[in-house]
Amino acid sequence: GDPPRFCRDKLCSGDGDCSVWCTAGCNHDMGKCDTL
């Protein structure tokens, strides 16, 4: 639902920028948070 979609839309420079819902942390290739 909402958390994974939110993760993929959130820009990040490191895993610390991503919420606990973003189980894959920061996807550096895309510069966005991601889920597993």
UniProtKB/Swiss-Prot annotation:
Q: Which UniProt keywords apply?
A: Disulfide bond, Hydroxylation, Secreted, Toxin
Molecular function terms, GO-annotated: toxin activity
Cystine residue pairs: C7-C22, C12-C26, C18-C33
| Tissue distribution of the protein | Expressed by the venom duct.
List the InterPro entries hit by this protein, alphabetically. Toxin_Pg
Q: Which family does it belong to?
A: Belongs to the Pg turripeptide superfamily.
Name it. Turripeptide gsp9b
Natural source organism:
Gemmula speciosa (Splendid gem-turris)
What are the leading ranks of the lineage? Answer: Eukaryota, Metazoa, Spiralia, Lophotrochozoa, Mollusca
